[in-house]
Structure formats: structure tokens, C-alpha cells
Curated annotation (Swiss-Prot):
UniProt gene name: gtmA
Annotated keywords: Antibiotic biosynthesis, Cobalt, Lyase, Metal-binding, NAD
PANTHER family with a match to the protein in the record: 3-DEHYDROQUINATE SYNTHASE (PTHR43622:SF1)
Catalytic activity: D-glucose 6-phosphate = 2-deoxy-L-scyllo-inosose + phosphate
Cofactor note: Binds 1 Co(2+) ion per subunit.
Protein name per the record: 2-deoxy-scyllo-inosose synthase
A UniProt-annotated Pfam family: DHQS_C
């Protein structure tokens, strides 16, 4: 499958297949790069990066650059360290940065490509579900600041995305669920026609065959493309992709690696749905659907007690959507839904100014829920986050 990703005036191909590493190698060789800089983390390097370099090296200069895995290490220091290594290896303007990993490596390598020589070519080889179905469908390349997530970065387009669903077979439970939470987001906020497919396909054990993964990724591509085609900087219609991210980012940052990105966003969606319901916009059936789909995906819908709720509320003040609305001092700009696939708009953007007191009230209740969690009619065994059912491997989400 090949689709053209359209983000405003930007176009690039997304090639999706299964067991297609040979084709990926041919695509990379065809770029006639002076050097291929294969950027991985400490998980994806041994799993995929080493084999890529081995296959490429007889035909084109290729080097493996490995960074420590994990969201806590997504910062400017990582970008600088990897860029210095690339330059010492002989990188020049004709080199290509190849990001092999999940969302973290994609952002680090993407920002590195944008900065080296003021911009060299970039290719994404996503190895996680969250990357294949979400992060590579964007021009955003960003790293974290000391006060919050994704506060330093730029917009930079890849030459192409080359994806092999076979790479998802090594994905741990935690990272599969992480990606599925973003897929659920796309269905609830953008493409409700996906809901019945997800109800049928989602599994609490997070074990999927290649065909199901292919369908899930394909549907997510269509969902995301529909709101970014005329909004390459994701500052108007594309802001709907931030659904669940206001509180979700704050939870993720506070958890300091204890929760995956997608799991935190899932919790952020539960908060956003309940906030919208209390403001009189979203009906209870739609709120319950949030919990149902997340539960079916194997995600938690209660904020863990280890997460410091006061710190979560503090981190909301550093959300990367600040400034889009003329927010009162004690409020937060959030993407809220008035119905499935129906974000609420204000001043030309799908954002609503919400009192911080209401957000805090809902956050506290979801951490110590009086609202019952959704229970499947025919429950199956739930695998705890972090447990790897069969295979060990990873991408970084």
C-alpha cells in the first residue's frame, strides 16, 4: 500500500507493507545518499537498526547511531549528542537521517535532520503502532523542556515513511496499548465510522495478527489525513489531534516514564469527555464509549495513585496550546467534543477555555473514581501494563 500524505503544500509517500524490509533497503539505496545515518534507541538498534546497516553497508555508507530509550531522554541534549556523532562520522548536506523507532526517536531524529546544515533529508521507519498510525503523519518535530512536553521544536517534512507491520510483532504489550489509545482517539474525535471496527477488533491481551494491524493503521491514516490536509502546522482543524493531550501530557510528564504516551492520552480523553459532559456538551453514552474502547484496548481508565495530582495540575500551566485562546488566568485550553467526531469550536479553532477548577475536580474523581469503570459484558483476562505476553522488544512510543 502506498498513499500520498498531504499536509498543506507538503506531499510525501507513506509505504506500508508486511515483511518488506528488502523493499525498504532498496528505497534507501535509491536515495543516492552520501551517507545514511540510522538513528535508533537502545531497543530498536539491536532489533532493527543493526540488520539495516548490515544490508545497506555493502552498497552505501551507513552508520548506526543509538540513543538511550525513553521519553525522559527526549531533549535538546540528545539531539546535540547525536548530531555531533553524525558530523564526526562524516555527515554532509547529501546525507540522509533515517529514524528507526517510535515517537521519541522520530522526534529526536526529525529535529536533528532539520538542524544539521539547516536541513538534510529525513526518512521515517516507524517501529511502533503509535508511530505508524500517528506521529509520522505529522510535520511536528519536538523535544521536551524541563517544564513540559514538546515545547521546543519545528515543523519538518520527511522524504518518505517506510513502514513494515512485521516490526510490530516484537512490540511489548505496553507499547501496543499505547498506540491503540491514539487510534481510539482518532475514532472518537475524527472518524466515528471506525468505532464498530474497533469494538470487534480490539483485544485486552493486545495480540493482533498482521491483517488487523494493517487495517487499524490504514483507518488511522485516513482519519488523521482528513484534518491535516489543509492544516500542515496543525494549528486549526488539525488541533483536534490534541484531543486528550492537555491533561494527558501533564499526566505523562508527571509520571516520568511510568506511563506510556498513549496510555496517558487515554486518561486525558476520559477527563476531557467527563469535562465536556459536565459543561452540557457530551452525552453520557459518548462518555461511556470512551471507557469502553479504552478498556477493550487493554488500557486503564483510572489515574494510578502513584501520579501526583497536584503536579498534574501544575503542569497544565505549561501546555503547548497556551496562547491560542485569550484564556482567563485560571483556565486551560482543551479540545472537547460535542458528539462523536464533533469537536467544539471557538475563534476558528477546536478549542474551549475550561476553568482549571473543573479540570481539577474531574482529575481527582478519575484518580479516585466514584464513576464506575467500564466492564465488558464478556470479560477476558486483562494484561497489566508493562507485561510482555510473548516477545520482548520495543519501540519507544
Amino acid at each position: 500500500m502506498e498513499v500520498e500524505i498531504r499536509l498543506g503544500s507538503v506531499r510525501y509517500p507513506f509505504r506500508l507493507g508486511t515483511d518488506c524490509l528488502g523493499a525498504i533497503v532498496e528505497d534507501l539505496v535509491a536515495m543516492s545518499a552520501s551517507r545514511l545515518l540510522i538513528v535508533c534507541d537502545s531497543n530498536t538498534g539491536p532489533l532493527f537498526g543493526a540488520e539495516l546497516v548490515e544490508r545497506l553497508s555493502p552498497r552505501v555508507p551507513a552508520n548506526l547511531l543509538i540513543h538511550r530509550a525513553g521519553e525522559p531522554y527526549k531533549d535538546l541534549q540528545a539531539v546535540g549528542t547525536l548530531a555531533d556523532s553524525a558530523l564526526q562520522l562524516g555527515a554532509d548536506r547529501a546525507s540522509v537521517v533515517v529514524a528507526v523507532g517510535g515517537g521519541v526517536i522520530g522526534n529526536i531524529a526529525g529535529l536533528m535532520a532539520a538542524l544539521l546544515f539547516r536541513g538534510i533529508r529525513l526518512v521515517h521507519i516507524p517501529t511502533s503502532l503509535i508511530a505508524m498510525s500517528d506521529s509520522v503523519l505529522s510535520l511536528k518535530q519536538a523535544v521536551n523542556a524541563c517544564v513540559g512536553k514538546n515545547l521546543m521544536g519545528t515543523f519538518y517534512a520527511p522524504e518518505s515513511v517506510l513502514a513494515d507491520t512485521a516490526m510490530l510483532r516484537s512490540l511489548p504489550f505496553r507499547e501496543t496499548v499505547s498506540g491503540l489509545c491514539e487510534v481510539v482517539k482518532n475514532s472518537l474525535a475524527i472518524r466515528p465510522s471506525m468505532v464498530e471496527m474497533l469494538r470487534t477488533s480490539l483485544r485486552q491481551d493486545a495480540v493482533y495478527d498482521d491483517e488487523t494491524m494493517y487495517e487499524i493503521i490504514s483507518e488511522s491514516i485516513l482519519a488523521k489525513a482528513s484534518v491535516t490536509v489543509d492544516d500542515m502546522h496543525e494549528c486549526r482543524a488539525g488541533l483536534v489531534l490534541e484531543y486528550g493531550h492537555t491533561v494527558g501530557h501533564a499526566i505523562e510528564y508527571t509520571a516520568a516514564g511510568g506511563l506510556s504516551h498513549g496510555q496517558a492520552i487515554g486518561l486525558g480523553m476520559v477527563v476531557a469527555a467527563e469535562v465536556s459532559h459536565r459543561l452540557g456538551h457530551l452525552d453520557q453514552e459518548a462518555v461511556a464509549l470512551h471507557r469502553e474502547l479504552l478498556t477493550r484496548a487493554g488500557a486503564m481508565v483510572t489515574i494510578p495513585e502513584e501520579v501526583d495530582l497536584d503536579e498534574v495540575m501544575h503542569r497544565l500551566r505549561f501546555d503547548n496550546k497556551r496562547g491560542y485562546l485569550a484564556d482567563p488566568a485560571e483556565s486551560s485550553a482543551m479540545v472537547l467534543l460535542g458528539g462523536l467526531g464533533e469537536p467544539l469550536w471557538h475563534d476558528g479553532r477546536p478549542l474551549v477555555s475550561v476553568p482549571m477548577a473543573l479540570v481539577g475536580e474531574v482529575v481527582n474523581e478519575i484518580a479516585r473514581p466514584e464513576i464506575p469503570n467500564f466492564e465488558l459484558v464478556a470479560p477476558v483476562e486483562t494484561v497489566e501494563e508493562g507485561r510482555v505476553p510473548d516477545t520482548v522488544g520495543a519501540a519507544d512510543g
